[in-house]
Amino acid sequence: MAKEGLGLEITELRLGLPDAEHQVSVVNKKNEKKRAFSEIDDGVGDENSSSGGGDRKMETNKSQVVGWPPVCSYRKKNSMNEGASKMYVKVSMDGAPFLRKIDLGLHKGYSDLALALDKLFGCYGMVEALKNADNSEHVPIYEDKDGDWMLVGDVPWEMFMESCKRLRIMKKSDAKGFGLQPKGSLKGFIESAAK
């Protein structure tokens, strides 16, 4: 700054953005056109204002400021509003290398769920597994809120929807080692849903 006449201003190290002196004058010109908050009105018919009606632009009110609220809390808030309509649970099947999600709220009973699982994994036999567990090679089980694994169909549908955290379709031989014995108890649920 002592050597202003030598042309070394370009290579001089200083705090701030490069060419900040030039930008300060540009920023000041932009700020001259801005109005203070107290000068802003609600846009209610002020035709005799000093700036004139034609120069003023109507500002659109945004419902949210960009970047606020944080994305996580925004998604959480929106998911709470839609919580009753969407009840996704993860579904895994023994032998399948992937997991799927299914919306329990779309299904009216165990028979609809069994048909959806048949379509989802491309294996046919879930309806038979729910009707007569002795003749099928797969057994559908679910994990409830307490972390206990139970057979699908042991409880009424509404209670199942409230307590189900995830579904698993096991091979019947593994289910016996797991401590679950298929009882064929869904026969009444399937027959009542079919009527």
Curated annotation (Swiss-Prot):
Q: Name one Pfam family in it.
A: AUX_IAA
Keyword Transcription regulation listed? The answer is yes
Say which domain of life the source belongs to: Eukaryota
Q: Which GO terms describe its biological process?
A: auxin-activated signaling pathway; regulation of DNA-templated transcription
Give the family, as the similarity comment puts it. Answer: Belongs to the Aux/IAA family.
Q: How does it assemble?
A: Homodimers and heterodimers.
Recorded protein name is Auxin-induced protein AUX22
State the organism named in the record: Glycine max
